[in-house]
């Protein structure tokens, strides 16, 4: 069974957390889902410094920082909006503020306002391309990177409110 089917079948946040923590790219990057809210509205991801995710200058690989935040808004919104919606990651940018070392953390949340904006923007079948900022923090709470995630969201044809 493919990863997408497994994600869709994950009936609880606990099961999705377990699945994602055994996902090969996450294992290889040293990324771990630390917390997923039971209502799918918050995810906390951590990455500890390891020999296998350290670059030539002794800091975290930039790609590993991005992989920490990559699928989470998409996955949360897939669960929150249900099968009536198409949700894809469309684009992203990341700004590296300072070298990341030690344990890094990113928290992503979906608010009532975000869900309301999605439902309103897609009610007539239009695509919606929201942008969600994400910060990655070090152990002292300093921002090491800022990312901007753009999603593609559309209500599936033939679905009425």
What are these regions (language model features)?
Residues 1-44:
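Non-catalytic linker/capping segments at the edges of enzyme domains
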Residues 2-10, 100-101, 111-161:
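HotDog/MaoC-like acyl-thioester-processing domains
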Residues 29, 41-43, 88-92, 102-106, ...:
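A generic structural signal for short beta-strands and their flanking turns/coil linkers
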Residues 29-33, 90-96, 117-119:
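Short structured motifs
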Residues 32, 93-95, 107-109, 135, ...:
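Residues located in well-ordered beta-strands
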Residues 49:
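Short, charge-patterned binding micro-sites
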Residues 52-72:
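Hot-dog-fold acyl-thioester-processing enzymes
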Residues 76-113:
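Hydrophobic beta-strand-centered segment that forms part of the acyl-chain substrate-binding groove
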